[in-house]
Amino acid sequence: FYVEDFYLFIYFISLVAIFFIFFNFNYNYSSIFFSLVSSISNIGISLNDTPSNLYFIFLVLVIIGGSFFSTSSGLRFLKLYSLIKFSINELLSHSRPKHLYINKFYFSDTNIERSDLYKYFLSVLIFVISLFIVWFLLTISNIEIEAAFKLAILTLMNTVNSSMYNLSDISFFNMSFITKLILIIFMIIGRVELLTVLILCKKFLFKK
C-alpha cells in the first residue's frame, strides 16, 4: 500500500531525527537507534546500554507500532493519523461551518472513508479496554502495578520484554499457571486483533 509506506517512511525519518537531536545521551546513539527500531517494529530486543529513562517513550512507540517488519503489530501509525486528522477537521468544521474539510491523505488522491474511521476508532477502543483488563488481571496476580501495566502493553502488542522497558527483572518462570494463561490468551488476541475475532464470532454465531 503506497500511501501507508510513504507515511511510515516520513514517520521513521522524523523519529530518527528527533532521537538524534534530543536523546543522544553520552553519544550512544547506536544503542538508542537499535531500541527505536526494535520498538516501532514491536520486536522488543534492546542492548544493555540503552538509557532506562526513555522507557516511557519506547512504550508509546510500541503502542503506535507502524508495521515495520511486521504485519499486525501496534495500533498502526496510519490509523492514528487518520483519526487525528478526522478529529481536527470535525473541530474546524464546527468553528468554520462555511468551509469544507475533506478527510484526505496528503500527497495522495485517496480519501479516508468514514467506515474505515469507525473501524479504526473501534480498534483503539478495544485496545484500551483490553489493556485495562490485562492490567487488572496481572495486578491481582501479585505483580507490581507499574510492571503489570508495562507487561499488559507488551503482551497486547506481542513485544518481548527487555531492559529498555525496565522489565528485565520479571521472571515468567515464577509466574502462576493462571497468569501465564492470561498472557498467552491476550497475546493471541493482540496478534489477530480482537475486532477480527468479534467479526468472526458475529458471522458464525448470528447466522440468519
Write out the residue ranges for each language-model feature.
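Membrane-proximal intracellular helices of multi-pass ion channels
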Residues: 1-208
